[in-house]
């Protein structure tokens, strides 16, 4: 197929794209694919690492969201994506915070009118016409309310984008997304990667997670696809994570990173997926696709 492949990743906050799909995004952009990332909020309720940005948080100046626009822009540039896309425009819906976070605004993403959120994403899908859409599983990966809601909104938008044409809620020509994936954490890959870390990879304050702290991962038999990126793509992922400096610290060797909880996780080149919609392409001996574009008529290189 001579057409340029198009992939769309839908995430809740800045940094989610790099943590979950950084190597995948870099893998496809380096092969000439058109990749876009939609971010649903500015991540205003995020914690920050260290004192340097402490006054930006919601409890102080409440300027973290605006600052994170710059972080996301730099991270996407490292991954080969030209610019971020914010659902409804930057700042339209606010980070809802973790479960139990005080409601600071009537614009919380989880409280938004679904006609508006789904409609905004349908418009993006119909404009970009992606061959692949990626978002979280129904649990939002680890259960963050915005991640769960992003799954709900994206699932509804993928379905609605292919139905009808030119309505007030869903303008534009319909587009049926050929393949729809959930991004998931491959548990065995994470455990193997964590076991391979050595003290030189870690900062002194970091600890390796216990098994119950990574219980949201998927076993191998629950996975449908893997993107096994090369070292160049993994290096781009490291650079993207480093760009999210309010949220992520990359270790001294670039083999591990941690959030504000100081749990050290390996920075993996392999990223895993579950096929939620569309037909699978060729699978390997593990029963996994090794290309999200498999079965769509593109060449093995993804272009």
UniProtKB/Swiss-Prot annotation:
Residues that hold Zn(2+) according to the record: 13, 16, 147
Enzymatic class: hydrolase
Gene3D superfamilies assigned to the protein according to its UniProt record, in alphabetical order: LmbE-like
One annotated GO molecular function: hydrolase activity, acting on carbon-nitrogen (but not peptide) bonds, in linear amides
Assigned EC number: 3.5.1.103
Annotated family: Belongs to the MshB deacetylase family.
Protein name per UniProt: 1D-myo-inositol 2-acetamido-2-deoxy-alpha-D-glucopyranoside deacetylase
